[in-house]
Amino acid sequence: MVKVIVLLPRRGDMSPEAFGQYLRETHLPLVTKLPGLRRLVVNWVLPDPNGSPPAYDAVSEDWFDDAAAMGAALASPEGQAVAADVPNYLDLSRFALLVVEEEDVPLPTGSAASPAG
């Protein structure tokens, strides 16, 4: 399984509210049509504890069976529609896309998040 992590900075002329609305109502419906997409998660970035604005507004995680499935999805007509929409809401000078393989790291027994904890 491969995951595409996308760092999503909104365009400077968009408010956070307009960005969220555009992402939810326009862009994500395009992403959900990607062939071979297994899972889609959007993480909304919270303000920094010191009050400074976050560098990114959201981070998306898109899961595919493998790199070939991801490549096929991005090359498909649906993938081309997703790519064509990106400049409508993202600051392309700060946008980043990472292709990763996830590895679960077991926590020590007794830790707060471990099953036996």
Feature roles, as predicted:
Residues 1-117:
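Macromolecular interaction modules
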